Structures are given as C-alpha cells and as structure tokens.
Amino acid sequence: MIQMQTMLDAADNSGARSVMCIKVLGGSHRRYAHVGDIIKVTVKEAIPRGKVKKGDVLKAVVVRTRKGVRRPDGSVIRFDRNACVLLNNNSEQPIGTRIFGPVTRELRNAKFMKIVSLAPEVL
C-alpha cells in the first residue's frame, strides 16, 4: 500500500535511486496504490549522469510492495522493499532500458508488457 509521502526504490536504470510518491493517480480521493497502479513521484536521490535528476516529477508504476499481492489461490507475494519503475509522463513507457529485481505477474496487461519482458524474474 503506497500513499503520499511514501519513499520507494527505483527498480530501473533511469538514474534515480530513491523516489517519493506525491500523488496516487486514478480517482478523485484515492488514498492507496498497489502493484500495477500508476503514481506521481518526485526524484529524491539520483546518480550523476543519469537520465533523470533530483527534483524531476514523473509518473511511475508500482512493481513491488511490502504489503504484497493476494492471488486467487490464497497465496500472498510480499517483498522486502517498495519499488517502482519510472515512466515517461506522456507515453507511459519505461524511461530505463533495464529492470532490476523480480516483478509480479499482475503487471502482465497490455500497458506493462514491456516491463515484464525486461524483468529478470516474474513471480
């Protein structure tokens, strides 16, 4: 469950290390974002010579949460850290060309197939 002010790791090679959620998109008073939801983030920590810099405001898709994802068979997939993949504000395609760490099968819709194909492991 990601809400405003939540700090997340950037799970791609866009140049951001740490980002903060500033808005949960989709609905007028939506409070929480889960895996597969799009959020608005600001870059809090970035590496030198990256594609993004500190202070940039971008869209991102949540790929891992500590809360986890409940599957229809009753199992829950949980992670140690909250993580997201940064997206282009207009096209909503990933900024980075590599994804680090596993992603969940819940991202396998038409919008995020690029992220699933780049990920080293799909749980």
Curated annotation (Swiss-Prot):
- Top-level taxon of origin: Bacteria
Q: Which Pfam families match?
A: Ribosomal_L14
Q: Which InterPro entries match?
A: Ribosomal_uL14, Ribosomal_uL14_bac-type, Ribosomal_uL14_CS, Ribosomal_uL14_sf
The molecular function terms of the Gene Ontology recorded here are: large ribosomal subunit rRNA binding; structural constituent of ribosome
Question: Which GO CC annotations does the UniProt entry carry?
Answer: cytosolic large ribosomal subunit
Is rRNA-binding included in the keywords of this UniProt record?
Answer: yes
- Which processes are annotated in GO (biological process)? translation
The UniProt keyword set, sorted, is:
Ribonucleoprotein, Ribosomal protein, RNA-binding, rRNA-binding
Which NCBIfam families does the record cross-reference, listed alphabetically?
A: rplN_bact (TIGR01067)
> According to its UniProt record, which protein family does this protein belong to?
Belongs to the universal ribosomal protein uL14 family.
Chain's role: Binds to 23S rRNA. Forms part of two intersubunit bridges in the 70S ribosome.
HAMAP family associated with the record: Ribosomal_uL14
The protein's assembly and partners: Part of the 50S ribosomal subunit. Forms a cluster with proteins L3 and L19. In the 70S ribosome, L14 and L19 interact and together make contacts with the 16S rRNA in bridges B5 and B8.
The name on file for this protein is Large ribosomal subunit protein uL14
Q: Which gene encodes it?
A: rplN
